[in-house]
């Protein structure tokens, strides 16, 4: 296990185009290329553990992959049965979306992952897929990986999801593309929409009407992707928080997706008083541009709406809460408990270790702003917890243990961090 010591930062000014490529889009690029007629061309693909696992799975499913280090070309003449266990590593997105993709494929497939992924709930995917005819099973009656899939004919469906989850929605959309009739999917609030945007751009017949997504089965293979993957706003947000809590600091985050369902955390930071400006530069399946963030004194807010739009950024946003004036409140965020760790407990315990007053409830927590103090934090193998408390360290210094998990989403995180503060690594 490795550890990092982060030192308090002085005022900094950083402009960077080196934020990690978007993880959600990279996963989808690898998978959706399997549905295309022709060769998909993907530049700036995220070369992190999670997404490279998805790329390896696609190859194991019969795709031809040509990677020159800059552009990845993927071509496929259909999904083939693999003799390998399909290893999703740490990625819940990978496992859940592959369930939807493979549920109608000809063959038998086994999906597994690391010790953390094998503890995460999968019934939210396996249950609705089983209801439409998928032959899918796993431990605890399909709730835990490894998952076994035998491709089958799928029935048309009208599914009403009880949770707002882009992973559930995406899995059902992928299943719907090969169902025996038109399908619809509804959710209690709009979740992230990369799948709809990308598949529609490839020629899939998908219509979104409020909270209802309607999908027609594919009549033919889709057009291949040609995309430069934008920077990941979830990764960019760590450095936005660093600038927002460090007096006289600013950062410009270049080439980030400005998809409204992905920048809600920036909007929350803006409501707290941070000086944030968005600069659109292009549109490739979705808007892309630069985000400018400057330090300003922060005030407390309540976060309870559109939770699925900022669920991944809440740990980092909580560091901003700890530096704000007043009590910030998080509600309706019970989904945090089934991420790579129980992120409600890990955030609460981490902030308490840093001297911050925090109260935990079943679906969230409250944070009374104060002065962060240096502490020793265990990431619990969760990349977002690790990076969030490392960013907290720019205000006071911090030691964070078990940092290898950061490679699942942001391999060059420390290269960028070194541009704003001093870090030291140790092996335990």
Curated annotation (Swiss-Prot):
<dbReference type="InterPro" id="IPR013792">
    <property type="entry name" value="RNA3'P_cycl/enolpyr_Trfase_a/b"/>
</dbReference>
<dbReference type="Pfam" id="PF00275">
    <property type="entry name" value="EPSP_synthase"/>
</dbReference>
<dbReference type="GO" id="GO:0009423">
    <property type="term" value="P:chorismate biosynthetic process"/>
</dbReference>
<feature type="active site" description="Proton acceptor">
    <location>
        <position position="312"/>
    </location>
</feature>
<dbReference type="GO" id="GO:0005737">
    <property type="term" value="C:cytoplasm"/>
</dbReference>
<feature type="binding site">
    <location>
        <position position="28"/>
    </location>
    <ligand>
        <name>3-phosphoshikimate</name>
    </ligand>
</feature>
<keyword id="KW-0808">Transferase</keyword>
<feature type="binding site">
    <location>
        <position position="165"/>
    </location>
    <ligand>
        <name>3-phosphoshikimate</name>
    </ligand>
</feature>
<comment type="subunit">
    <text>Monomer.</text>
</comment>
<keyword id="KW-0057">Aromatic amino acid biosynthesis</keyword>
<keyword id="KW-0963">Cytoplasm</keyword>
<comment type="pathway">
    <text>Metabolic intermediate biosynthesis; chorismate biosynthesis; chorismate from D-erythrose 4-phosphate and phosphoenolpyruvate: step 6/7.</text>
</comment>
<dbReference type="GO" id="GO:0008652">
    <property type="term" value="P:amino acid biosynthetic process"/>
</dbReference>
<protein>
    <recommendedName>
        <fullName>3-phosphoshikimate 1-carboxyvinyltransferase</fullName>
        <ecNumber>2.5.1.19</ecNumber>
    </recommendedName>
</protein>
<dbReference type="InterPro" id="IPR036968">
    <property type="entry name" value="Enolpyruvate_Tfrase_sf"/>
</dbReference>
<feature type="binding site">
    <location>
        <position position="92"/>
    </location>
    <ligand>
        <name>phosphoenolpyruvate</name>
    </ligand>
</feature>
<dbReference type="GO" id="GO:0009073">
    <property type="term" value="P:aromatic amino acid family biosynthetic process"/>
</dbReference>
<dbReference type="InterPro" id="IPR001986">
    <property type="entry name" value="Enolpyruvate_Tfrase_dom"/>
</dbReference>
<dbReference type="InterPro" id="IPR023193">
    <property type="entry name" value="EPSP_synthase_CS"/>
</dbReference>
<feature type="binding site">
    <location>
        <position position="343"/>
    </location>
    <ligand>
        <name>phosphoenolpyruvate</name>
    </ligand>
</feature>
<feature type="binding site">
    <location>
        <position position="24"/>
    </location>
    <ligand>
        <name>3-phosphoshikimate</name>
    </ligand>
</feature>
<keyword id="KW-0028">Amino-acid biosynthesis</keyword>
<comment type="function">
    <text>Catalyzes the transfer of the enolpyruvyl moiety of phosphoenolpyruvate (PEP) to the 5-hydroxyl of shikimate-3-phosphate (S3P) to produce enolpyruvyl shikimate-3-phosphate and inorganic phosphate.</text>
</comment>
<feature type="binding site">
    <location>
        <position position="384"/>
    </location>
    <ligand>
        <name>phosphoenolpyruvate</name>
    </ligand>
</feature>
<comment type="similarity">
    <text>Belongs to the EPSP synthase family.</text>
</comment>
<feature type="binding site">
    <location>
        <position position="23"/>
    </location>
    <ligand>
        <name>phosphoenolpyruvate</name>
    </ligand>
</feature>
<feature type="binding site">
    <location>
        <position position="312"/>
    </location>
    <ligand>
        <name>3-phosphoshikimate</name>
    </ligand>
</feature>
<feature type="binding site">
    <location>
        <position position="167"/>
    </location>
    <ligand>
        <name>phosphoenolpyruvate</name>
    </ligand>
</feature>
<dbReference type="GO" id="GO:0003866">
    <property type="term" value="F:3-phosphoshikimate 1-carboxyvinyltransferase activity"/>
</dbReference>
<feature type="binding site">
    <location>
        <position position="23"/>
    </location>
    <ligand>
        <name>3-phosphoshikimate</name>
    </ligand>
</feature>
<feature type="binding site">
    <location>
        <position position="167"/>
    </location>
    <ligand>
        <name>3-phosphoshikimate</name>
    </ligand>
</feature>
<dbReference type="InterPro" id="IPR006264">
    <property type="entry name" value="EPSP_synthase"/>
</dbReference>
<feature type="binding site">
    <location>
        <position position="120"/>
    </location>
    <ligand>
        <name>phosphoenolpyruvate</name>
    </ligand>
</feature>
<feature type="binding site">
    <location>
        <position position="339"/>
    </location>
    <ligand>
        <name>3-phosphoshikimate</name>
    </ligand>
</feature>
